[in-house]
UniProtKB/Swiss-Prot annotation:
Domain of life, source organism: Bacteria
Name this polypeptide is given: Alanine--tRNA ligase
Pfam families xref list: DHHA1, tRNA-synt_2c, tRNA_SAD
GO cellular component: cytosol
Organism from which the protein derives: Prochlorococcus marinus (strain AS9601)
Organism lineage: Bacteria, Bacillati, Cyanobacteriota, Cyanophyceae, Synechococcales
InterPro entries xref list: aa-tRNA-synth_II/BPL/LPL (IPR045864), Ala-tRNA-lgiase_IIc (IPR002318), Ala-tRNA-ligase_IIc_anticod-bd (IPR018162), Ala-tRNA-synth_IIc_core (IPR018165), Ala-tRNA-synth_IIc_N (IPR018164), Ala-tRNA_ligase (IPR050058), Ala_tRNA_ligase_euk/bac (IPR023033), DHHA1_dom (IPR003156)
Domain commentary: Consists of three domains; the N-terminal catalytic domain, the editing domain and the C-terminal C-Ala domain. The editing domain removes incorrectly charged amino acids, while the C-Ala domain, along with tRNA(Ala), serves as a bridge to cooperatively bring together the editing and aminoacylation centers thus stimulating deacylation of misacylated tRNAs.
Length: 886
């Protein structure tokens, strides 16, 4: 056979290249991997190899060719808890696929799949089992009669296993799956394909041949399609003869680096450590690709998925004993491992490592905040931390459950683990519903309804007024033929002068009108190049086909144009003042302000903000004329045009150029000259997530109004402080100095009171077995003063001191404070201030915690203060007497 002449394929790269080469020779067009950020609004991430082809399968987009093949990077997080636990679950994986769009069907798909796995990958027939849908006799016959597989190797399964569908309605069809048998010696009787130790499914052939209507009836599709998927990691496990996917050359080099940092050996590690190693190895691949595709860590959407993955990596690093920052070192290995097939990883190397570093540092700080929140829960006197609270600590603060349980147990508090698991299951179900299905149905939503419309022609760059024809009217997302006065509508036109919200710029407002109708348009959105005009009918009736005119508000368009041009100038100024690597992470161009999000690990100083404002205003005064041209994307990038990181652009792009200042790819509206902006003012700068800063600014009339309001405020302050505007700074400084002096005097008086009070009781210490016990009530001191008194008493009494103070700071508030301070020798015999104070405070319906030598607590029941202090004294006397007996 020809397989004897073919080089043995083993490595992950060889498997991928062989697959693409094989189908390329079968006249399939090789399609590069799409981004992990899909064009499809119904899914958050690219979760399957076929997702980039979904519009083709639906007939909404022209097919790239009749046949296609790809190696598509994918991410799924719906089974994240199984990652590292099973041999084959991953968040990041590569799906090899071959696709037919109305060309070949079952026979060729099966024949070529068999040729690939037996001739190219050289798998033995003895190791292959095939499954088919139990009603799909056609596929079963092809496998047995034409391929020659023995019927005992063909397993017929039901609809749940071998019938693919995108939803309750839409395209669907049977599928046939290829399984690898690791133990063929066990024979072919009573085969159970669910036996994960023996079988692994590695190639799925979907025969998309039916359309299912709402009644469940199946009818043949006009064009039958093929959609296949082969997991690269699974095929690597098979060909490299490994126990699991993680030990293949696709992931194991990352795991080896983790072992080096943790100073452990993978093969001699226990199961718990191996799971942590696998999780970090898997998540590393997901994280570097997400960041490279433009995702930044945040608390929303894709950003939250990225943040969660990074936090899991840090957590499992801690479980392995890694206490220092380590993720950038791991990520570098992942980048080096995959950059040949994904050059974007190399190009974005610095960005990836910086994002990971910042997020790791931030999470370590978050862990500290989580510990503080946990301390508050413990201090509240609760004897049980609810599952909801434990899950909040885990989900919001990234605080591991086992850490919550461990700390709670130190304070004799239980954690509702079952309740935590219930909350976790609720989240899992939400995740599955959001991320595991690819919707190919066409009914029921605005997203699908607009597919029937042609692209809206936008002619609003040169004119604000034009004629148009109504092509669609929506009421409550339902397509209707007409609408009447008073109704809120969504209108689709054949052409428009209204700018549709995109690129951060808000949609225009204005009117759509004719002689007998008027619609006030308050927003315009753009979806799939169809402009959606939202408005209210003020008079008349709208009908499909009606001729109307569009009239955009010129004043608001001018404001948006000024703010959009100002945004471009701001980005150039940021690059000049801070760093050339500054890039846009998001923006808002509204009528009254602009907002710009950008990558920066450090806050922007006041001096830098001043320089940025000065630079932008100098460009405004220089009166630069803008040049706007359409050109190919490659030409624009060669000329130095700035593109937003992670944004998708057509082959032809619009370039907005302020010569010598700024050049960007942009579809927004702009002024003709920079002097039209008038002035520019930054009103705020803040961090919004790890490594991302936000600037809000004003231009034009909004900036002038801001200056006017500030001037009025200065005049009001001048009147209030009885000082001229130029004397305000000196006047406020003097007032601050006076306030500081007054506070010092007050604190001095508090310290004197505290000194007097603790001096009056320090001689009342009781000696028990050589230890000095001082338990007393001191009222009228705040927390700081009570703490100071306890520490001074401990210092006075020495290493064998045991000081417990309780008091009422203010009788009107009816709250108690407790402080426990122990000398070194008291700690050595086993006393723990944190545990002791918790028991004392509970008597008064309170709680607290702290370190072995010092702790503080709060409580509510002031009537039981004496009982609490008596308990403390009796407990110490018994404990020390017991220590004496020993």
């Amino acid at each position: 056979m020809t397989s004897q002449l073919i080089k043995k394929i083993v490595t992950g790269d060889e498997i991928r290249n062989a697959f693409l080469k094989f189908y390329s020779e079968k006249l399939h067009k090789i399609i590069p991997s799409a981004s992990l950020i899909p064009d499809d609004p119904t899914v958050m991430l690219t979760i399957a190899g076929m997702l980039p082809f979904k519009p083709v399968f639906l007939g909404l987009k022209e097919r790239p060719s009749k046949r296609a093949t790809s190696s598509q990077k994918c991410i799924r997080t719906n089974d994240i808890e199984n990652v590292g636990v099973t041999a084959r679950h991953h968040t990041f994986f590569e799906m090899l696929g071959n696709f037919s769009f109305g060309d070949y069907f079952k026979r060729e798909a099966i024949q070529w799949a068999w040729e690939l796995v037996t001739n190219i990958y050289q798998l033995s027939v003895e190791n292959i089992i095939v499954s088919v849908f139990h009603e799909d006799e056609e596929s079963a016959k092809i496998w047995s009669d034409e391929i020659g597989i023995h019927p005992d190797r063909i397993v017929k399964l039901g609809e749940e296993d071998n019938f693919w569908s995108s939803g309750k309605t839409g395209p669907c069809g049977p599928c046939s799956e290829l399984y690898y048998d690791f133990h063929p010696e066990k024979g072919l009787q009573n085969i159970d394909l669910e036996d994960g130790d023996r079988f692994i499914e590695f190639y799925n052939l979907v025969f998309m041949q039916y359309n299912r209507d709402p009644n469940g009836k199946l009818t043949d599709l006009k064009f039958k399609n093929i959609d296949t998927g082969m997991g690269l990691e699974r095929m690597a496990q098979i060909l490299q003869k490994k126990q699991n996917n993680y030990e293949t050359d696709l992931i194991f080099p990352i795991i080896q680096k983790i072992c080096e940092i943790a100073n452990i050996d993978y093969f001699s590690s226990d199961d718990k450590n191996k799971i942590s190693l696998k999780i970090i190895g898997d998540h590393t691949r997901a994280v570097i690709h997400l960041i490279s595709d433009g995702v930044s860590a945040s608390n929303l959407g894709r950003g939250y998925i990225l943040r969660r993955l990074i936090r899991r990596m840090v957590r499992h690093g801690r479980l392995l004993g890694i206490t220092n920052e380590f993720l950038p070192h791991i990520a570098s290995v992942g980048i080096n491992l995959m950059q040949n097939n994904y050059p974007d990883l190399k190009n974005n190397n610095d960005l990836i490592l910086n994002e990971i570093k910042i997020e790791e540092i931030r999470f370590r700080e978050t862990l500290e905040r989580g510990e503080k929140l946990l301390d508050e829960l413990i201090s509240s006197g609760q004897k049980l931390i609810s599952g909801f609270k434990a899950f909040e600590l885990y989900d919001t603060y990234g605080f591991p459950l086992e850490l919550t349980v461990e700390i709670a147990e130190e304070h004799s508090i239980s954690v509702d683990v079952k309740g935590f698991e219930e909350e976790m299951n609720v989240q899992k179900e939400r995740a599955k519903a959001a991320s595991s299905n690819i919707d190919l149905t066409l009914e029921g939503s605005l997203e699908r309804e607009i597919d029937v419309f042609n692209k809206t022609v936008f002619n609003g760059y040169k004119s604000l007024l034009s004629e148009a024809e109504i092509k669609g009217i929506f009421l409550d997302s339902t397509l209707v033929k007409e609408a009447s006065e008073g109704q809120k509508v969504l209108i689709v036109l054949d052409q428009t002068t209204f700018y549709g919200e995109s690129g951060g710029q808000v949609g225009d407002i204005g009117t759509i009108f004719s002689n007998d109708v008027e619609v006030l348009v308050d927003n315009v959105m753009r979806k799939k190049n169809v402009f959606l005009h939202y408005g209210t009918i003020k008079k008349g009736k709208l009908t499909i086909g009606q001729k109307v005119k569009t009239n955009v508000s010129s004043s608001n368009r001018a404001k948006a144009a000024a703010n959009h041009t100002a945004t471009h100038l701001l980005q150039s100024a940021l690059k000049s003042v801070i760093n050339e690597s500054v890039g846009q992470k998001g923006s808002l161009v509204a009528f009254n302000k602009l907002r710009f999000d950008f990558n920066s690990s450090n806050p922007i100083s006041k001096d830098q903000i001043s320089k940025i404002e000065t630079l932008v205003n100098s460009w405004i005064m220089e009166n630069h004329s803008l040049e706007i041209k359409n050109m190919s994307k490659s030409e624009a990038l060669e000329k130095g045009a700035v593109a937003m990181f992670g944004e998708k652009y057509d082959d032809e792009v619009r370039v907005v150029n302020v010569p010598g200042v700024s050049m960007e790819l942009c579809g927004g509206t702009h002024v003709k000259t920079t002097s039209e902006l008038g002035s520019f003012k930054i009103i705020s700068e803040e961090g919004i997530s790890a490594g991302v800063r936000r600037i809000e600014a004003l231009s034009g009339q909004s900036a002038l109004d801001y200056f006017s309001d500030r001037n009025a405020l200065v005049n009001q302050l001048s009147d209030l402080l009885k000082a001229n505007p130029n004397q305000l700074f000196e006047r406020v400084n003097n007032l601050q100095a006076e306030l500081i002096n007054k506070n010092k005097e007050i604190q001095k008086m508090k310290d004197e009171i505290a000194y007097f009070k603790y001096s009056s009781i320090k001689s009342s210490a009781e000696i028990v077995n050589s230890f000095s016990i001082l338990v007393n009530q001191i009222d009228g001191l705040d927390g700081n003063s009570l703490q100071s008194a306890a520490l001074n008493l401990t210092s006075h009494l020495g290493n064998k001191a045991i000081v417990i103070l309780g008091g009422i700071p203010n009788p009107e508030n009816r709250k108690l404070l407790f402080v426990v301070s122990l000398g070194d020798d008291a700690v050595k015999i086993g006393l723990h201030a944190g545990k002791l104070i918790n028991e004392i405070a509970r008597i008064c319906s309170g709680g607290g915690g702290g370190k072995p030598n010092f702790a503080q607590a709060g409580a509510k029941d002031i009537d039981k203060l004496s009982d609490a202090l008596d308990y403390a004294k009796n407990y110490l006397q018994k404990t020390l007497a017991s220590h004496s007996d020993k």
